[in-house]
Amino acid sequence: DCLPGWSSHEGHCYKVFNEYKTWKDAEKFCKKQGKSGHLVSVESSEEGDFVAKLISENLEKSHSIDFVWTGLTYKGRWKQCSSEWSDGSKIKYQKWGKQQPRKCLGLEKQTEFRKWVNLYCEEPQRFTCEI
């Protein structure tokens, strides 16, 4: 069972937050939402579709190009992708968009929140938590 305002999928609970935070602050915020709380990790095509629909339905409209943080970051000075999501789960599914030299990953509105894009970690974005 999920808390009020959260959506359930495959034993996890998800919520889209319309406030803007850096990747690090969004991850800290998600950790405070509940036991095992983290930025969303997309571990299958089905989960990706669920998350994309949830974001599309719950993200407040804006006139800017919208991105939503995921729990994936690059680690190390060569910007190699980390081998796990911020919640510690392994990467079993990938859906990359155009790659650029940025270290934090988000979902892009132009792809209906289905493709992953590299973003600057310090640039505030909206985000989705998973618990």
Swiss-Prot record:
Domain of life according to the entry: Eukaryota
The UniProt record lists the keyword Disulfide bond: yes
Signal peptide positions on this chain: none
Tissue/organ expression: Expressed by the venom gland.
C-type lectin domain boundaries: 1-131
A molecular function GO annotation: metal ion binding
Keywords per UniProt: Blood coagulation cascade inhibiting toxin, Calcium, Disulfide bond, Hemostasis impairing toxin, Metal-binding, Secreted, Toxin
PROSITE patterns: C_TYPE_LECTIN_1, C_TYPE_LECTIN_2
InterPro entries associated with the record: C-type_lectin-like, C-type_lectin-like/link_sf, C-type_lectin/snaclec_domain, C-type_lectin_CS, CTDL_fold
Cellular component, GO, one term: extracellular region
Sites where the protein binds Ca(2+): 41, 43, 47, 130
Described purpose of this protein according to its UniProt entry: Anticoagulant protein which binds to coagulation factor IX (F9) and coagulation factor X (F10) in the presence of calcium. It may bind the gamma-carboxyglutamic acid-domain regions of factors with a 1 to 1 stoichiometry. The dissociation constant (K(d)) are 6.6 nM for factor IX (F9) and 125 nM for factor X (F10). Does not bind carbohydrates.
Quaternary assembly: Heterodimer of subunits A and B; disulfide-linked.
PANTHER family linked to this entry: MANNOSE, PHOSPHOLIPASE, LECTIN RECEPTOR RELATED
Protein family: Belongs to the snaclec family.
Protein name, as recorded: Snaclec coagulation factor IX/factor X-binding protein subunit A
Taxonomic path: Eukaryota, Metazoa, Chordata, Craniata, Vertebrata
